[in-house]
Amino acid sequence: MSNYSVTNIGPLDSWRDHFGGFVPATTRTGRRVVDHELDGDVIGISATAYEPGEQAGYWHSHSEIDEVYLFLEGEGQMGLDDEVIDVHPGTVVQVGTGVMRTWRCKPDSPTQLRWLCIRAGVIPLPAIPDDAVPITDIPMPW
């Protein structure tokens, strides 16, 4: 057998139908942890779709994993430490270790905000990114 695996996450307009996450507290409609369906262990990927006005509702940071967010559709914002940036189709954001992050789909977005998050570290990634530190005592930046 060759060293590859394949899955199909469907067209963009079907992403909202999936219900998933890493742990029960962050499991939600519109999230799919794609790497749980693949055989690799050093790169992770998730596909997410938020409705207009929907937000993560929490911040998080990583101590050993970098993330790259590739926004495909919709209008949104990312909170990155003490900054807020606008994101839209074609925006690519690399977030290094130690940076707090959160995101939302703008209330006036004409479509769902859809993006891929690619995670990688210098060590094999666990199925649940156990280096994530939820930060619940800081309000959303919007």
Regions inferred by a protein language model and the residue ranges of each:
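Double-stranded beta-helix
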Residues: 102-142
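Conserved short histidine dyad/triad with adjacent acidic residue
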Residues: 29-33, 46-63
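Short beta-strand His + acidic residue motifs that chelate non-heme Fe in jelly-roll/DSBH
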Residues: 58, 78-79, 95, 101-108
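Short acidic-glycine-tyrosine-enriched beta hairpin
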Residues: 82-97
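A short, N-terminal "cap"/entry segment at the start of jelly-roll beta-barrel domains
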Residues: 1-43, 128-142
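Conserved hydrophobic/aromatic beta-strand scaffold that supports enzyme active sites
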Residues: 45-49, 68, 92-94, 102, ...
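Short, charged/polar surface micro-motifs in flexible loops or helix N-caps
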Residues: 40-43, 51-55, 75, 121
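Glycine- and acidic-residue-biased ligand/ion/polar-headgroup-sensing regions
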Residues: 64-66, 70-76
